[in-house]
């Protein structure tokens, strides 16, 4: 009896969550919240394709609040944002860190916004690699490639010199919303929905 009640409660919760996301999609908004993983990326990519199929002219608004996560999953979202014909606006809120910044930068520079109290973190990729020395060496080379690629992307999208980006990301580099605006991660600070472009 208790098991049935638990399953019913879970089903009701999942149904409510599904309704919420359906309503959210109807307003052409996507919420990327939490650690970026393969599963999260798959869900975000699916929403992007659905919204593109409904209209290629009406913009998509993606709200990003993420401590980072899987860089490859972040690139999957990044590439699809660039792939779809629909204009995409990214809005940073809360904490936008690491791979979260990668997703934020997928929008064109004048289509990147930040809420007033958002914070940003850029740094070099992290590794928890363990194993034999040869595997660690291979992994270290791949990490360095990823680091160089991310630094080049940040420099290209912000206009900050590659040397400065490399220096900044050598350690955790924190920015508040105003500093992120000055750095070029975002193009506008906003406080209300009316501040977002409609077309």
Swiss-Prot record:
Record's keyword terms, sorted: Cytoplasm, Hydrolase, Protease, Serine protease
Any GO BP: protein quality control for misfolded or incompletely synthesized proteins
Active site: 98 (nucleophile), 123
Stretches that traverse the bilayer: none
Cross-referenced SUPFAM superfamilies: ClpP/crotonase (SSF52096)
InterPro entries noted in UniProt: ClpP, ClpP/crotonase-like_dom_sf, ClpP/TepA
Recorded catalytic activity of this chain's protein: Hydrolysis of proteins to small peptides in the presence of ATP and magnesium. alpha-casein is the usual test substrate. In the absence of ATP, only oligopeptides shorter than five residues are hydrolyzed (such as succinyl-Leu-Tyr-|-NHMec, and Leu-Tyr-Leu-|-Tyr-Trp, in which cleavage of the -Tyr-|-Leu- and -Tyr-|-Trp bonds also occurs)
Primary localization: cytoplasm
Enzyme Commission identifier(s): 3.4.21.92
Localization, UniProt: Cytoplasm
Domain of life according to the entry: Bacteria
Pfam families recorded: CLP_protease
Uppermost EC category: hydrolase
Keyword Protease: yes
GO cellular component, one term: cytoplasm
CDD domains to which the protein is assigned, alphabetical: S14_ClpP_2
Gene Ontology MF annotations: ATP-dependent peptidase activity; ATPase binding; serine-type endopeptidase activity
Subunit organization: Fourteen ClpP subunits assemble into 2 heptameric rings which stack back to back to give a disk-like structure with a central cavity, resembling the structure of eukaryotic proteasomes.
PANTHER family, alphabetized: ATP-DEPENDENT CLP PROTEASE PROTEOLYTIC SUBUNIT
Family statement drawn from the similarity comment of this UniProt entry: Belongs to the peptidase S14 family.
Functional summary from the UniProt entry: Cleaves peptides in various proteins in a process that requires ATP hydrolysis. Has a chymotrypsin-like activity. Plays a major role in the degradation of misfolded proteins.
Descriptive protein name: ATP-dependent Clp protease proteolytic subunit 2
């Amino acid at each position: 009896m208790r098991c049935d009640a638990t399953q019913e409660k879970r089903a009701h919760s999942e149904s409510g969550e599904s309704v919420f996301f359906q309503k959210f999609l109807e307003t052409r908004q996507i919420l990327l919240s939490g650690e970026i993983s393969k599963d999260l990326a798959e869900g975000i990519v699916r929403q992007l394709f659905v919204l593109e199929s409904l209209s290629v002219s009406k913009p998509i608004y993606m709200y990003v609040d993420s401590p980072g996560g899987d860089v490859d999953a972040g690139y999957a979202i990044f590439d699809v944002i660039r792939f779809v014909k629909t204009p995409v606006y990214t809005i940073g809120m809360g904490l936008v860190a690491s791979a979260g910044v990668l997703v934020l930068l997928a929008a064109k520079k004048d289509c990147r916004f930040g809420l007033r109290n958002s914070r940003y973190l850029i740094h070099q990729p992290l590794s928890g690699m363990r194993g034999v020395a040869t595997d660690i060496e291979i992994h270290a080379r791949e990490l360095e490639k990823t680091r160089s690629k991310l630094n080049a992307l940040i420099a290209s999208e912000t206009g900050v010199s590659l040397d400065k980006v490399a220096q900044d990301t050598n350690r955790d580099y924190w920015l508040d919303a105003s500093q992120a605006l000055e750095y070029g991660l975002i193009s506008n600070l906003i406080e209300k929905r009316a501040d977002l472009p409609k077309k």
